[in-house]
Regions:
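Alpha-helix-loop-beta-strand connector modules within alpha/beta enzyme cores
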Residues: 2, 63-95
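Glycine-rich anion/phosphate-binding loops
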Residues: 29-35, 99-116
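N-terminal amphipathic alpha-helix/helix-capping segment at the start of soluble metabolic enzymes
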Residues: 1-20, 27, 86
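Hydrophobic faces of well-ordered beta-strands that scaffold small-molecule active sites
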Residues: 16-24, 47-51, 93-97
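Acidic (Asp/Glu)-rich catalytic clusters
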Residues: 8-13, 38-45, 80-90, 111-117
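Glycine-rich, proline-tolerant flexible connector loops at the mouths of alpha/beta enzymes
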Residues: 25-28, 44-78
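N-terminal glycine-rich phosphate/pyrophosphate-binding loops that anchor nucleotide-derived ligands
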Residues: 1-6, 29-34, 40, 57-59
């Protein structure tokens, strides 16, 4: 079900709903801890899980008197995490990203990556 359908269903029924927001795991860590933290919440029937895709961390590195701007992403695999959580929990997942930090082409790549259904 799409999020707009969830909103419309709640609106039409007059019911209230809620969502959960999580961060993807830090590079090199497992999704298991996130899943464990969601276990007590899933029976409460959240309408969707929102996964934050953060802006890159930018820092200057000076090597051999040459300064270079380097971008890194301490939290990666947002699309993979979104797909895995949706399959494992059955709850709709909404990945979102801070688009102000990316080019149009990078955003296009992210949208393609987020097409996990």
């Amino acid at each position: 079900m799409k999020v707009i359908d969830i909103y419309n269903s709640l609106k039409d029924s007059g019911k209230k709903g809620f969502s959960i927001e999580i961060l993807p795991p830090v590079k090199g860590t497992s999704l298991d801890d996130i899943e464990k933290s969601l276990l007590p919440i899933i029976p409460l029937n959240p309408q969707f899980i929102n996964i934050t895709f953060h802006a890159p961390v930018r820092k200057f590195i000076n090597e051999n008197n040459v300064t270079t701007l380097v971008e890194s992403h301490p939290r990666t695999a947002t699309a993979a995490v979104a797909g895995a959580l949706k399959r494992r929990t059955g709850i709709e997942v909404v990945p979102h990203l801070a688009s102000a930090y990316y080019t149009k082409l990078q955003l296009e790549d992210f949208v393609i990556d987020f097409s996990y259904e």
